[in-house]
Amino acid sequence: PSTQLVDMYEFKDGRPFNWDEIFPGYNAMTPEQRKELLSVEMDGSGTIVGLREADTAKILSAYTCRDPRLMATVIVPYSHYMGNIGRTTNVDLIFALDHNLAGNANGGTIQNNAGWVSYLYRKFVTEGDQGGAISNRLHTPFAFPLIRFADVLLMLSEAYNEAGQLDKAVTEFNKVRARVGMPGLNSGPAWMVV
């Protein structure tokens, strides 16, 4: 997932996300300055051996203070996920930003934002040993949805909007937001008015 996608997830109160609210001056920083702020030192095995300037709890809070669908969709820095590659048992892993890692053409997970900061998909990706080949969805017990209820509601909302029935469009749209406790459109704050 791109940094642009992740940054589109709003704060839990519905305000647009802004890195400067978490780390003042972040938006004006160069990629190298951001790397200094967000990265840790890791050894060859992927173990964190030094925090450098990184406040990993504060970095993680930049993601957990937002729309809960972000954490369900994306593995963000300093969050946990279940890994299994090359092992016979599942391992609880932390996705950390290694200061010594440099982007290159072979590292698909490190291409965003001047070749350094990136994210991993969580939603619809199997984690750990699912008892089947991860390269073929038919060989895993993970049930991939063909159509999602939220998609149906959003399509209905779009149809109402195209038909000029904004109130009905907002009602259907808000059903999706309400499922995760996000404030509805036209629910009070100025930033939620459409």
Language-model segments: residues:
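Acidic/polar-rich alpha-helix caps and helix-coil junctions
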Residues: P1-V194
